[in-house]
Amino acid sequence: MVYASLGKAIEENCPEEYVEQAIQNDPNSLNAVDDDKRTPLHWACSVGKVNTIYFLLKQPNIKPDEKDEAGWTPLMISINNRSVPDNVIEELINRSDVDPTITTRGGQTCLHYAAGKGRLSIVQLLCDKAPELIRKKDLQGQTPLHRAAAVGKIQVVKYLISQRAPLNTSDSYGFTPLHFALAEGHPDVGVELVRAGADTLRKDSENHTALEVCPDRIVCNEFLEACKEQNLEI
């Protein structure tokens, strides 16, 4: 089968032998970019072809940190793809030619994505490698803790709290991590945030507290009851 490019071939799940032969025939294809500015490594990470990822990373001239049109690196794509296991992502992070502090066009970092996906071991490694990312805001003013709280990733929330992530930082809409936790229906996360010192009276840009943006009475009651049981002041 004939493919338009090596990246397209990987996207369409070509045999692994094809990748090796293509690079032997044309070494420049290793880092060639398509119309989306994606390299073959971007596509291998996108479709979760682990053996191909390893093969590409072993090539001496590989450029593993290129940005695509949206500013995404192969590392970012891997973190967002559940079919790419943690050990592959860890290898990318530990490479000297990969910068985990790169941001997308939206200002997100790898830690934003790892936190939002609940990939605790990756969150821990990124925090060790680049602790400044813990406080990094994207263009919407959101930190990794905002991301983790919004999707209910409580183990990541606990870890970020232990690393002194800012609890009461507001995004561009005035939402704190606590606002997100309750608005998205995660009372257990809300309790963890309050236990750590989150301000329950902080208001968003429309003058609403976290409890006031909680749309579900059951969630609100679970949160209030748990706080009461643990003698947490609201």
Curated annotation (Swiss-Prot):
Q: What is this protein called?
A: Ankyrin repeat-containing protein C6C3.08
Give an example GO molecular function.
Answer: protein folding chaperone
The UniProt record lists the keyword DNA-binding:
no
Q: Name one GO biological process term.
A: proteasome regulatory particle assembly
Family annotation (InterPro entries):
Ankyrin_rpt, Ankyrin_rpt-contain_sf
Q: Which Pfam family name is an example for this entry?
A: Ank
Q: Which GO terms describe its cellular component?
A: cytosol; nucleus
| Renumbered ranges of ANK repeats | 36-66, 70-100, 106-135, 140-169, 173-203
Gene3D superfamilies per the record?
Ankyrin repeat-containing domain (1.25.40.20)
Q: Which organism is it from?
A: Schizosaccharomyces pombe (strain 972 / ATCC 24843)
Task: Could you list this entry's UniProt keywords, alphabetically sorted.
Answer: ANK repeat, Repeat
